[in-house]
Amino acid sequence: MFFFHKIVIPIIIGIIQGITEFFPVSSTGHMIIFIDWLDIKNKDTKILEIFVQLGSTISVFLFFYKKIIQILQLPMQKESNEKKNIHVLISILPTMFLGLIFYNKIKSLFNPTNVMYALILGGFFLIIAEKFKPKKPKTNSIKEINLVQSLIIGCFQTLCLYPGFSRSGASIAIATLLGFKRSVAVNFSFIISIPLIAGASVLDLIKNIQNVNMLNIPYLFSGFTISFIISFLLIKKFITILNKVSLTFFGIYRFLIAGIIYFI
């Protein structure tokens, strides 16, 4: 049992996080389901979820760091870049604000039943976005994103606070409805995910730091490492898939997982 809990579990959870992070299917929801099914929910797995999310977030940062630097630096085109900074800030503020205020309530929702409901609702949202998106994209680069679009994306992104809804699912779906080219919606979604997930992970870690000790550090580090490696090696391939595959496919996948939760 020691081998299973301390070695196999962090590897599996790291793989789950590393794969599902890049699709609009809720990586958090998948981890909640897996941990509940194996009946292994405890202080260690709670901390492990934080570490594996940090692993995939760092891989996203490394993949997008050139685009992030272009947004954050203020060279000759100062006004333009400041504008981009504001866009990113506006897109993350609603979720940060509500996440801080309702932190304890949000954490109380972390169970398979709530994940099932969120998977279904999020699935419908993805299918609706695919069906009713503008025939021709109106926003073809991150530079073209305006403040109103950023605010709308930020508001809809708060749906991810309900476990299982999917942050990328909410942001990509609403961006698609707003007329974003798919690659722009995907890139912007992942760029604004970095400060959100990093901030949420740090907050979770601070609130649970008492559960980190010398005995579980190897366990946590192995989950972090697996998540980072899987994410880093596959991110380019996964984003290519996400740019090409219909959102309806992911909506149907979410329905299937919700059905499995219901019947099992």
Swiss-Prot record:
Gene Ontology cellular-component annotations: plasma membrane
Principal subcellular localisation of the protein: membrane
Keywords tagged on the record: Antibiotic resistance, Cell membrane, Cell shape, Cell wall biogenesis/degradation, Hydrolase, Membrane, Peptidoglycan synthesis, Transmembrane, Transmembrane helix
Enzyme Commission number: 3.6.1.27
Segments crossing the lipid bilayer: 7-27, 45-65, 86-106, 109-129, 145-165, 186-206, 215-235, 244-264
Location of this chain's protein in the cell: Cell membrane
Keyword Hydrolase: yes
Catalysed reactions, as listed in the record: di-trans,octa-cis-undecaprenyl diphosphate + H2O = di-trans,octa-cis-undecaprenyl phosphate + phosphate + H(+)
Any GO BP: peptidoglycan biosynthetic process
Any single Pfam family the record assigns to this protein: BacA
Note: Bacitracin is thought to be involved in the inhibition of peptidoglycan synthesis by sequestering undecaprenyl diphosphate, thereby reducing the pool of lipid carrier available.
Family listed: Belongs to the UppP family.
Protein function: Catalyzes the dephosphorylation of undecaprenyl diphosphate (UPP). Confers resistance to bacitracin.
Designated name of the protein: Undecaprenyl-diphosphatase
